[in-house]
Regions:
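Active-site acidic/histidine proton-transfer and metal-coordination neighborhood
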Residues: 20-26, 48, 88-90, 106-207, ...
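Histidine-acidic metal/acid-base catalytic patches
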Residues: 6, 17-35, 40-57, 88, ...
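Active-site-proximal loop/turn and secondary-structure-junction residues that shape catalytic pockets
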Residues: 40-42, 65-67, 100-103, 142-146, ...
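Conserved beta-strand positions in the central sheet of alpha/beta enzyme cores
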Residues: 62, 96, 139, 176, ...
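Residue-level detector of anion-binding/catalytic polar loops
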Residues: 59-60, 93, 136, 174, ...
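Conserved alpha-helical segments that form or flank metal/cofactor-binding pockets of metalloenzymes
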Residues: 86, 95-97
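Glycine-rich, proline-tolerant flexible connector loops at the mouths of alpha/beta enzymes
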Residues: 64-84, 142-144, 148, 246
Length: 302
């Protein structure tokens, strides 16, 4: 099996019985594509992230939607034209738009009804931004509910995603939903939570993903998401983990057995995009971290 990324070709041998064990058909995986996440660049001009992505050999951008760069209201007020220009200049597409929404001032799972409406209005505008940017997905995660009773929490979650899915359908856009670690949320931390939400809301424009830190800190594997979600698993966040927090580290600097996990992901049939998700831990050295992260992943391919 051939796996191509950023001009590098790696050979992986995946035994047929592994695929059969997962009940998946045989096929050739042609490409794993890597994205740069712009969050740690928030103290620098956004153009620096695009320039680095091009120079280091990334395949796409996952755009963090927060100030000063690409906060949804700012994009809709005119800033979007600059992001489109950067995509064209650097030949670097924005494939995922990830609005900031689990910290101040927005969390649709927490607060009063008026605060929920405010958060949803923001996310509805974010969906429009994702569509206008040309992104394939807008990424929505599920924040802390403030220990809301389970029934009320479930109703609020499903109500939120029905509204978002209806708007995405109107825009001809898609949403990818992310679980979080137990250090970030009091619910929605497992692949089964994702499947249950997708099944209950029932819109075909909703998909799931896996941030590999999430299963790792809970004694699970990323491949479990593919077994549970099947073809509805469309995106991946790669970062290493210390195993005891939500900290996202450079691949190879933590405890995740990346080579084995990547092997298993491919055996399960995942051949999509993978954003190397470095966040504020590397806010002082985003360029060096972005370069090191991709180099580390490529060494693991060899």
């Amino acid at each position: 099996m051939t796996w191509r990324s950023g001009g590098t070709t790696a050979r992986w041998t995946i035994e047929t019985n592994k695929r059969e064990a997962y009940g998946l058909p045989r096929f050739e995986i042609e490409e794993m594509r890597y994205g740069l996440f712009t969050c740690p660049y928030q103290r620098l001009p956004l153009e620096r992230a695009f320039a680095d992505a091009k120079a280091f050999g990334y395949d796409y951008i996952e755009l963090w939607g927060g100030r000063p760069h690409t906060f949804a209201p700012d994009l809709l007020a005119g800033q979007l034209r600059e992001v489109l220009r950067l995509q064209e200049q650097y030949e670097m597409p924005v494939e995922v738009y990830t609005p900031e929404h689990n910290a101040y001032p927005y969390n649709y799972m927490l607060g009063s009804e008026s605060q929920w409406r405010d958060a949803m209005d923001y996310l509805l505008r974010s969906l429009r931004c994702g569509r206008e940017l040309g992104a394939q997905y807008t990424l929505i995660s599920v924040g802390h509910s403030g220990f809301m009773p389970e029934k009320a929490r479930r109703e609020r979650l499903c109500r939120s995603f029905r509204l978002l899915a209806e708007e995405a359908e109107h825009l001809n856009h898609r949403i990818v939903i992310e679980t979080l670690t137990p250090y970030e949320t009091d619910h929605f931390t497992h692949a089964e939570d994702l499947k249950a939400l997708l099944d209950e809301v029932g819109f075909g424009n909703l998909f799931g993903m896996c941030d590999v830190v999430v299963p790792f800190v809970q004694g699970e594997t990323a491949a479990h998401y593919i077994r549970v979600l099947g073809a509805r698993m469309v995106h991946l966040h790669l970062a290493d983990s210390d195993g005891v927090s939500d900290t996202h580290l450079l691949p190879g600097e933590g405890k995740i057995p990346f080579m084995g996990w990547l092997d298993e992901l491919h055996a399960c049939g995942y051949d999509g995009r993978a954003t190397i998700e470095l966040v504020t831990h590397y806010i002082d050295t985003p360029s060096e971290a972005a370069r090191q992260a991709l180099e580390s992943i490529r060494r693991m391919e060899a």
